[in-house]
Regions:
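A short, structured active-site edge motif that brings together acidic residues
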Residues: 68-81, 103-109, 163
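N-terminal binding-site loop/beta-alpha segment at the start of enzyme catalytic domains
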Residues: 1-71, 122, 189-190, 256, ...
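Short, acidic/polar
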Residues: 25-38, 81-97, 143-146, 167-168
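Residues at the N-termini of beta-strands
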Residues: 44, 100-103, 134, 158
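CE4/NodB-like, metal-dependent polysaccharide N-deacetylase domain
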Residues: 85-106, 125-129, 150-151
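Beta/alpha (TIM)-barrel catalytic core signal, keyed to glycine-rich beta->alpha loops juxtaposed to Asp/Glu
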Residues: 109-275
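Alpha-helical scaffolding within the catalytic cores
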Residues: 2-7, 55, 59-62, 88-91, ...
Length: 275
């Protein structure tokens, strides 16, 4: 089996291309999930203040037999804390029992309140202090990103967005790439594969490679140059989602999956959410 791939970010830091997402997992569930994930080979864990499970993540990491330097931990600044990023980060660090965060993301731009530039400036300072290795955003549209860059001169290293075969966001993905912003996919399986896993192209590729539909979709993300964080608390699925390093999709196969794009957003609209 090939080794799990890593991505070099524009700030020089490196992150695993495949990680474990823990949205909707309780503190208890997340401990077991992370233990399993680390055993399987995951080294990247994606949580958020809004998930209310940072304490569980912290306990799991405290008990882990993996060195901190080998781990890549992401958490996120919630919408209510755009004017107090320092306090929010310190609270997250305390719950996670960590001295620093590998990647701190602003969870949503919340343009109705319009404090996201102020929040970004605060995150820049926290990075300078060494409390954060890398800083990025989630759910930012092109105009939000351009404003951050114009007003601060600092470009996010990551833009984590809803991205799956039904919602491929190719224009935003391309814009991110042009500006050396790595695109990261949340809800990469389209909320459990609804409308994706039953597609003929996905089923045919699963048969061809002896893989599950979920593994085909995860491989599609990887071969499209995306960072991907499928969420699960089920041990068998956590292992299944990581067993994707022994095959690759070719250009024609990626092209067939590209045809599934419907622009179908399953989550909130970033221009409307919050506020």
């Amino acid at each position: 089996m090939a080794n799990p791939t890593v991505i070099k970010l524009q700030d020089g830091n490196v992150m695993p291309q495949l990680g474990l997402g823990v949205w909707q997992a309780s503190n208890e569930e997340v401990i077991t999930a992370i233990q399993k994930a680390l055993d399987v080979g995951y080294r990247s864990i994606d949580t958020a203040a809004a998930y209310k499970n940072e304490e569980g993540v912290g306990k799991a990491l405290k008990n882990a037999s993996v060195n901190r330097e080998e781990l890549f931990i992401t958490t996120k600044l919630w919408n209510d804390d755009h004017k107090r990023p320092r306090e929010a980060l310190l609270d997250s660090l305390k719950k996670l029992q960590l001295d620093y965060i590998d990647l701190y993301l602003m969870h949503w731009p919340v343009p109705a309140i319009d404090h996201y530039v102020e929040a970004w400036k605060g995150m820049i300072e926290l990075q300078k202090e060494g409390l954060i290795k890398s800083i990025g955003v989630c759910n930012f549209q092109i105009h939000h990103l351009q404003r951050l860059i114009d007003e601060t001169g600092v470009t996010p290293v990551i833009n984590q967005i809803e991205l799956h075969p039904l919602m491929q966001q190719r224009q935003l993905h391309a814009w991110n790439a042009t500006h050396k912003i790595q695109t990261e996919s949340w809800s990469p399986l389209a909320q459990g594969g609804k409308g994706v896993f039953d597609q003929k192209v996905i089923r045919d590729l699963a048969d061809k490679y002896g893989k599950t539909p979920a593994q085909i979709v995860i491989r599609w993300h990887l071969d499209s140059g995306l960072v991907v964080i499928p969420k699960s608390v089920t041990p068998s699925r956590i292992a299944e989602n990581f067993d994707v390093w022994d095959f690759r999709l070719d250009k024609d196969e990626l092209g067939e999956i590209a045809k599934l794009d419907q622009g179908k957003r399953l989550g909130p609209d970033p221009d409307q959410f919050g506020g």
